């Protein structure tokens, strides 16, 4: 099993934790990570694009002029696509871009993302993460003590409102619960910081 130092909020080492190699020590599968990121980004698309077809645009259904004898090209409706203001042919309509990956693939993607962070030495474990009150200044101090200057993802076992409120105004910092971790956020942050209890919860769910 891989051993990782456990840090306090002040950055001091307070012990070690053994990570489950079946979750944090596998060979990252880049193809699965790619599929997971594409699927998650697809589900974030709004899909509310819409244009009007010839049955929806303004204008009567009357034939604009008689078929023959005018010298002009024959026309059946001013709502035809070749007219200015006419309907669009085969235009976009509202749709959902989301699709689900198989459960085994989703689990493998999470394990691959977590293992990649451990291999890159961008995975930190805190003994605990608690704040007496929602104070952005206090959370900024924690970032400084842990030498976290780039985008950082904090993962707690359960929702802690004081922690979430303290971090929400800090650019590049995201706080999630262990049940809410996802591949896009794991890969989208330089550093990933788990509490000890969050590690145990993830190992329980993915183990």
Swiss-Prot record:
Pfam families assigned to the protein according to its UniProt record, in alphabetical order: Ribosomal_L4
Any one GO BP annotation for this protein: translation
Gene Ontology molecular functions: rRNA binding; structural constituent of ribosome
Signal peptide bounds: none
Presence of keyword Disulfide bond: no
Record keyword RNA-binding present: yes
Family note: Belongs to the universal ribosomal protein uL4 family.
HAMAP family associated with the record: Ribosomal_uL4_B
Subunit architecture: Part of the 50S ribosomal subunit.
Function: One of the primary rRNA binding proteins, this protein initially binds near the 5'-end of the 23S rRNA. It is important during the early stages of 50S assembly. It makes multiple contacts with different domains of the 23S rRNA in the assembled 50S subunit and ribosome.
Protein name, entry field: Large ribosomal subunit protein uL4
Taxonomic source organism: Lysinibacillus sphaericus (strain C3-41)
């Amino acid at each position: 099993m891989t051993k990782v130092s456990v840090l306090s909020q002040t950055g001091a080492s307070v012990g070690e934790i053994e990570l489950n190699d079946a979750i944090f020590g596998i060979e990252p599968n880049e193809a699965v990570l790619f599929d997971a990121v594409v699927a998650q980004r697809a589900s974030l698309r709004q899909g509310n694009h819409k244009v009007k077809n010839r049955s929806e645009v303004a204008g009567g259904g009357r034939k604009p002029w008689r078929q023959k004898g005018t010298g002009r090209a024959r026309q059946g409706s001013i709502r035809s696509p070749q007219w200015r203001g006419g309907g669009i042919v085969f235009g976009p309509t509202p749709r959902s871009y989301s699709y689900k990956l198989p459960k085994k693939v989703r689990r493998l993607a999470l394990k691959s993302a977590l293992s990649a962070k451990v291999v890159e030495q961008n995975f930190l474990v805190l003994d605990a993460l608690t704040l007496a009150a929602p104070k952005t200044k206090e959370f900024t101090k924690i970032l400084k003590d842990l030498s976290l200057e780039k985008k950082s993802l904090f993962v707690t076992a359960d929702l802690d409102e004081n922690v979430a409120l303290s971090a929400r105004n800090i650019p590049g910092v995201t706080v999630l619960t262990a049940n809410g971790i996802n591949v896009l956020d794991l890969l989208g942050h330089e550093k990933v910081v788990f509490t000890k209890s969050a590690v145990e919860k993830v190992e329980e769910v993915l183990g």
